[in-house]
From Swiss-Prot:
Belongs to the methyltransferase superfamily. RsmH family. It catalyses: cytidine(1402) in 16S rRNA + S-adenosyl-L-methionine = N(4)-methylcytidine(1402) in 16S rRNA + S-adenosyl-L-homocysteine + H(+). Pfam families: Methyltransf_5. SUPFAM superfamilies: Putative methyltransferase TM0872, insert domain, S-adenosyl-L-methionine-dependent methyltransferases. The keyword Transferase applies. It is an enzyme of class 2 (transferase). This is Ribosomal RNA small subunit methyltransferase H. Its EC number is 2.1.1.199. It comes from Saccharopolyspora erythraea (strain ATCC 11635 / DSM 40517 / JCM 4748 / NBRC 13426 / NCIMB 8594 / NRRL 2338). Keywords: Cytoplasm, Methyltransferase, rRNA processing, S-adenosyl-L-methionine, Transferase.
Length: 330
């Protein structure tokens, strides 16, 4: 993500013009068996700029797509992009843990495909005044939904040193979390934080020089942690994954792309729990109805190719996992 932000700062251009969906061909390949058997329904839980959705609609003429996004700007732009398929598209302003409610609002209970492309979107990174990118001085906002109440500035200015340390350590995996938190508390006593440039300067000073030379941009982990906290990303994902898996019809498939280890571990655990037998290990035979609900379609997490990473820096950190429902839940 650091390399991506630096490149955006250097070469300009809007997300709408330069958006390249990550692992597009692999996503289409994995979802195709579930979507090519006549009329089908797929949910793009992280619609963003609509690149994956556009390709799915083009590949499957009988497909109905439900697109979810918490960002009203993303819904508007994706709606323009998907306008040629508007009779087969339902766009819903929702966070993806509102999965069941979104489907119920469309009188749907089961779906044939589910797609999650997690993390911050190209659109959000390119909109400087939203504060996601540390390469630009901007308001400390970081809300994926501009109508949400809590901003990154609120976190920085109101959390205790202990709370800040927890956020930085848990969500940024920042080994200097306590040191950074103490520096934030000292600095905000002089004046509240409201711009990202001041925070970046603090992080340069707080992170030891040796780590700055070897550990990437010193702001990377803190900005990730603040973004996750502001948007409750891990809590939302923890609720969304089981809801999405529950809604998959038998034969339905789900693809999840994550961009840091915290998300990927959650996806791995959610899939592993459903892919194992519920029969007690000391019994010699499988109990009826206790077999796995899903089968894994990927061996571990798949990575983007070197060629894709070179062409699309956002793909450098992607981890893709996929699964197929093979039986109804007990």
């Amino acid at each position: 993500m650091a390399d991506e932000q630096q490149r955006r700062a250097q070469d300009g251009g809007s997300a709408r013009d330069r958006h390249v969906p990550v692992m597009m061909e692999r996503t289409l390949e994995l979802l195709a068996p579930a979507l090519s058997k006549g009329p089908a329904v797929v949910v793009d839980a992280t619609l963003g700029m609509g690149g994956h959705s556009e390709a799915l609609l083009a590949a499957h003429p009988e497909l109905t797509l439900v697109g979810l996004d918490r960002d009203p700007d993303a819904l508007r732009l994706a709606g323009e992009r998907l306008a040629p398929h508007s009779d087969r598209v339902h766009l819903v302003h929702a966070v993806y843990d509102e999965w069941a409610e979104a489907l119920a609002g469309l009188s749907l209970s089961k779906v044939d495909g589910a797609l999650f492309d997690l993390g911050v979107s190209s659109l959000q990174l390119d909109e400087t005044d939203r504060g996601f990118a540390y390469a630009h001085d901007a308001p400390l906002d970081m809300r994926m939904d501009s109508g949400a109440p809590r901003t990154a500035a609120d976190v920085l200015n109101t959390y205790s040193a202990g709370e800040l340390t927890r956020v930085l350590r848990e969500y940024g995996e920042e080994k200097f979390a306590a040191r950074i938190a103490a520096a934030i508390v000292r600095e905000r006593a002089k004046a509240p934080f409201d711009r990202s440039g001041r925070l970046v300067e603090l992080l340069y000073d707080a992170v030891p020089a040796a780590s700055r030379r070897t550990g990437g941009h010193p702001a990377k982990r803190t900005f990730q942690a603040l973004r996750i906290e502001v948007n409750a990303e891990l809590e939302v994902l923890g609720r969304a994954l089981p809801a999405a898996l529950d809604s998959l019809a038998v034969g339905g498939r789900m693809v999840v792309m994550s961009y840091h280890s915290l998300e990927d571990r959650m996806v791995k655990r959610a899939f592993a729990e459903r892919a194992k037998s519920k029969t007690p290990v000391d019994l010699p035979v499988e109990l009826p109805g206790h077999g796995p609900e899903i089968r894994l379609l990927t061996r571990g997490a798949e990575l983007a190719s070197d060629a894709e990473t070179a062409a699309n820096p956002r793909a450098a950190s992607v981890r893709l996992r996929a699964a197929e429902r093979i039986k109804e839940a007990v």
